């Protein structure tokens, strides 16, 4: 190369790029292995003594289930103090928990032996007489990564070792020993805190210097770009202002689509802002919000609902952003700001860059009004149903688009710095979630053109500089993933998640598309089917057009082919995600909008060639609409409230919309077939290039997409307006905005009414009545109804859910059958009640004050009972706002009607109103049937709104009739009551620790999720559950103890009861339920353990054994 005055600066910049690239690459490579500061936590026992001087028990539910190591020593002399019959020497879980023997360590003594068992596997047995005689000195128990074992020191043959899989779950130390603190009595629990890490000084320096080196390398590469454009230096880089000017964004400004572009901007942005207020939430809003909220106390981003508390790394930086937002406010309208901003950014990129790149110049795609409007409509049709929540798909969609734009800029301007920046954006996108991997698709499809640029500049820049900078840019992934975690911890987290699942192999990715066709799930709704089907139609349609015609005038061939490649590669990369939820298609929303414009533009060109082409195009769209509308208009959770057709296919005038579109598609298909055969002999088949025909050729897709958008927005708007002032997401968002995000505005917690004490609202019989031996509830002469007439087994009917339900640990290829009942509603025996019943009562009803009558077992004659009259509250009409219901707790099969008029078969139970006349005689008034939200035959609260009562009514009674002799057809009931209610916010407040299930957490921003600290979970006092079906199909499965969810320690340490709840003025609604937790071992007997905190430095490759992730 000839020498000139510019060569030394060129060489210097090249050397800077090489040096910075090598530095960044090496530092990024070593960051995963660099040491971190790990917070340690240990528990030593005994910790204190009771008032009698005996050792106390302690409570310490470990998030990981098992400790890193456990060591317990019990003097044999202490064991000798236990009663001769049965006693608990020591255990790591209380005896009364659910299946605690299968999970914990239990050392039990009976009159013959002392048995040490890990997870129901016996490790050692010692004869009780030998222990009592003092033949052993101490019982030593241990569990670590090498195994679990026990040894009665001094007794031959009384020792044993089990495998490491028998390491016990620890929820504390529990014992029946009545001994003082003494030498030799000890327990040491080393909590597994491997994920609670912080970077050491050397790691911070490496991360900072590595990131700076990569940035310098990219800037140096950008300087080389400037000097190599057109073969000479563009500016004098020594001049400071000129040096700054070289980083300005230079964009071509071809003619635009005039007002259409502005209309599209206004329409899309206005719709996104409106959707931010009224739009549906996503299935993981509660999941991600809770992970973010507890991260500060936990010390890392822990998976709260599953996976034994494993870190969210390598996909954790987005949760860090959510945690920062949650520190300001947890209101949904605030937390969803990133998603809305991502949507706005996506559209602006599409309209103001992508379309210009795909079709510049006069007559090009970017100047076609219909194409621009189609892009906007298709973008909204893809964005609204998928990307309005806290899931990462909105940011992934933005990252995919931005990466493609930077790659195209690198190709168009031959600037390798843009390619390096695209690599950085792709890396950030890929670390949002597994499906973020699709961001590298644009890099792969643009790699060939970028390689050609590198080859062309080899003589001036060499190969080393650009390749090192690009490699360093890609290596930034290690800084994002391992900035505070290590290679070992991230690897362990991945191992646990793949071990626990659900994971579906890449060759089964067809299940993702199958889930779109499942009718009853929100993921198979028509609004989610439509954008995916249209994307596939557009992509393959454009592909056929380009293959057949090579190019379309006004459409840039290279960028279009790369866009097709990017989309196809993205769909291929999606196969490598471990889960196959249909909601992950939201990551393609930006590409869907772009393809809408390309398809409208390209199909308009070919549709003018023959009428057949236009007819085929319309047929394809009609078929897509038929397939899409075969799904329900369903949304997730509370977003369904008030939405038309949320659980059925859309219907117009009694006819399914899908049948209408299918019929039309068949007719147009037949027409297209006729037009095709007519081509063989017709003299003229080309469509005249008139304004009318151009309109017909260009508008089908924009009309269809706009209609779908209007349907989506209209559905949610209708629900918000028609239901007001009943609860909706829109109402909660508007209330939060009006209050300025005040913490006193608490969304659903302000509308859920609770009945903390159902006995307080119990109605009393009118004095002076005569009734039989069964009391006032049975009335004068009950036939077939008796106090014991309730089945012992009241488990509700099974819940059958279809495959593809998000956050459901069920089979992906067959229906899932599950059972779930609110605590205390599934039957059983209880203490003797006031009328001699042994029935276990639900909802906290006091058996000393609450009689029961039921017809179970009466299979020979028609059963009937009319209770005595019960006095309604005085001045009930004035207090109806605070006490709006009469409630009867009932079980069995009861006839009722849903809000839409559909009936539920059962036997008759009615409430009859009455009025006491001046002479003391009660005059019966109207009878009303109950509102019964189910499920049968479990205990539930039948609702009778007081607005149904005649104004003069002041008494009421229960009228039951069961003429059906089938053993499954019976009913039982308790006395009526007018509940004393308070809102859920008033009951729980904002400081009470609560377990909020995944589906409910985002709806209760004021409630505090129970915290995790130093690897120990805080025990919640309440649980907020979603509706019955969601609880059975999702919550109870995803949060299970086998999967490392919170049930791991909650079911072992707590018992539950259900609190009666109602959604204000929405009495037909099964909004969910609230359960109250009680410790099996009270806090005064087993206080929270005192934890000793420490700090150690751990190299990045040290694993220290696996976390036990087995059932």
UniProtKB/Swiss-Prot annotation:
Protein's UniProt keywords contain Phosphoprotein: no
Major location (coarse): membrane
Top-level taxon in the UniProt lineage: Bacteria
GO CC terms in record: plasma membrane
Subcellular localization(s) per the UniProt record: Cell membrane
Annotated membrane topology: Multi-pass membrane protein
SS bond list: none
Record family assignment: Belongs to the emb family.
Name of the protein: Probable arabinosyltransferase A
Source organism of this protein record: Mycobacterium leprae (strain TN)
